[in-house]
Every structure is written in C-alpha cells, then in structure tokens.
Amino acid sequence: MRILVDENIPLADEFFGELGDITRLPGRDIDAAAVREQDLLVVRSITRVDAALLEGSRVRFVGTCTIGTDHVDLDYLREAGIGFANAPGCNADSVVDYVLSSLLLLAEEDGFHLAGKTIGIVGVGNVGSRLAERLDDLDVECLLCDPPRAEAEGREDFLSLDALLERAEIVCLHTPLVTEGEHATRHLLDASRIDALAPGTVLINAGRGACVDNQALRERLQRANDLRVVLDVWENEPGIDPALYDLVDIATPHIAGHSIDGKMRGTELVYQAAMRQFGLPARKKLGQLKPDPWLRKIVLTPWAPPLEALSLCTRACYDVRRDMLAFDRYRRRMGMATGFDAYRAEYPLRREFSTLRVELKQNKGGLRDALEGFGFKVKLSSK
C-alpha cells in the first residue's frame, strides 16, 4: 500500500508504517500528480480535497487529522466510494488552552479578574463545550449559543446570538464554517453585529476565520479601536489582511489547536478509521508512542499568590505571547502569507495543560479550583 501524508503530521511513520510505503509532502504541495498512485491520503486543513485532487487516482481512503471538514468535498468522496474520516475533538483541549492563555494575558494587561465575568461561547461543540466545562470552575457566568444543537435537543438554556452578544463581556467563537442553509456561519459576526458590540468587549475567534467579517472588524477598530480582539483564524489564510493584523491585540497564525498532544490524537483517530476501512486490526495505541512532557510537575508553597501561581503554571505550559512574537518575526522576515505557513510548518513543541501536575502544599484562596479549571492536574500534599 502507498500512503501520502502531510509532512507535519506527527507519528505518521509509527502508526501507518506497517501498512506500506509512506511519502511525506508539505500540505500545500499535495496535488493531483502527487496523489495519483497513492492508496491512502492523510492531510491537514491546508490541503483542499476534491475531484480536482483525486479524479483518476488510486486513493481509497482520505483522512484529515483535523476537527473541521470544510476543506473536504464530502459529497464527491461519497459519490466516488472513497472512505473518509476526520478527527473530531482531537485538538479541542489545545484550543481551550489557547483561549485561557489569551484571557489570562488580557486580564493581566487590563487589570481585571476572570471571576465574575460574563463569557459568551458561540458554538458548543467539542471545543465550546470543553471551554464551558473549564470555566465552570472559575466563577464566571457562561452564556451558550448553538442554534443547531438548541433546535435538535430542545435546549432552552441556549441563547440566540444577538441575546448573547448583548450580555457577554467576552465573546468566544468556536463554530464550524457553514456557507449556506438556515444555520450558515459565514460572516456570523457581520458588520451590524460587530458595530453593535459594546465598547470594551473582548472578541476571540479560534474557530473559522470567515465566521467574522474581517473587513467590518477592521473598519470598527480603525474607527473606534474600542474592542480587545484575539484572532487565531482569519479570512483568506494565509494571505490575511495586514491592516487588521496591526489592529488586533493577539494575532496568531491558526495554531490554537497545534499542541503536539492534539496532533497525535488526530493521527491516532485517522489511523483507527483507516484500519476499519481496510478491515485490519488497529494494533498501535497512542499511549505506547506518546513522548513524556519535558515539564512534569510544579510544586507551590502555601505562600503562592493565587493569580501569580496560575499565571506561572499556565505560561510554563503555554504562553500565547511566544506565538505572537514568533509570528511577527516570521511575517516581517518572509512576508505575511509565507510567514504564516512557515511558522505553522515549523511550530515548536507544545504540550497541553493536562500534562502538567501541580502539587499544592495548601489550597489557599481557591487556587486548586482555579488550576483545575484551567485544566491542570492538581494534588494536595501535606509534606
């Protein structure tokens, strides 16, 4: 069997090596000529998978190591009889880590506490639901909006988008990109909704770039500059709007879900689906292959100030400022589009909060709840 894999997918050799010969290519270099003689294709979101790519090829199975599938023509795959799998939820915890690191940075810069804030989560799927679960331990009020789920499940606790935007001090977008239909999400935040945001609102988009009208957001910021904005996803990636880039508070190149833990989970999920497709046993397990984190434990004394302790643990695992500064260096050296892709391709090793164990000598000031809310493993010690 011949297997073509995006070069940035971790553990591909370990999981798929037993199946046959593996070829690795950059995601944007995977074209019709490259896939023609392949049996199995494993990609990320930067590779468009459709008839133009696969027509006339030997490909029998396509896996994308991502949650989203908007880069894949699912109708074509069904019609062509080509098996398919994505990796739902694989990097959800990584995205939540990104959001919490960003919120902590803004809270420190602006001098506010997350406790007592009203946070609106738009899109309550794998990412949004996990973000809500973690925030539950932080004494914040979570407002939830997910019209498809509200309709399917009869959820009366879900708000309409406009009701959420009217009340939320912090708005987090975690929706898929849906371009048509009753629940279309393209430009979900359009010019009218962006203009209606209260001054001082924090807007975080770590879902899909086109869910926010980037031009309208740029115009609001140019006109008033009265929002705090975190963008990890953008319209027209990688050729994003440089004027908008200059105006937002935290700008990163679609890396919120790029923890090595999330990537490895994605590889495992696609491997398992491929084994089912070809009627083979899935012998490899992620637990056998995952590397140990370089930082295993932090010990905090009873005198640790809660906010400083939370900040220390968060930044020990993941400091969003690292990505902000590194992306800025890349885009200044290479240009926006090339730098965007290059940083994603060369992204440094990052572990999730759950890989770090925090040992507390005393649960002072609700620190344990805050740390567990952020996703750390916490142990109380009497020693």
Swiss-Prot record:
Homodimer. It comes from Chromohalobacter salexigens (strain ATCC BAA-138 / DSM 3043 / CIP 106854 / NCIMB 13768 / 1H11). This is Erythronate-4-phosphate dehydrogenase. Belongs to the D-isomer specific 2-hydroxyacid dehydrogenase family. PdxB subfamily. The lineage of its organism: Bacteria, Pseudomonadati, Pseudomonadota, Gammaproteobacteria, Oceanospirillales. The keyword Cytoplasm applies. Pathway: Cofactor biosynthesis; pyridoxine 5'-phosphate biosynthesis; pyridoxine 5'-phosphate from D-erythrose 4-phosphate: step 2/5. Substrate binds at S45, T66. Keywords: Cytoplasm, NAD, Oxidoreductase, Pyridoxine biosynthesis. GO terms for biological process: pyridoxine biosynthetic process. It is found in: Cytoplasm. Catalyzes the oxidation of erythronate-4-phosphate to 3-hydroxy-2-oxo-4-phosphonooxybutanoate. The keyword Oxidoreductase applies. The gene is pdxB.
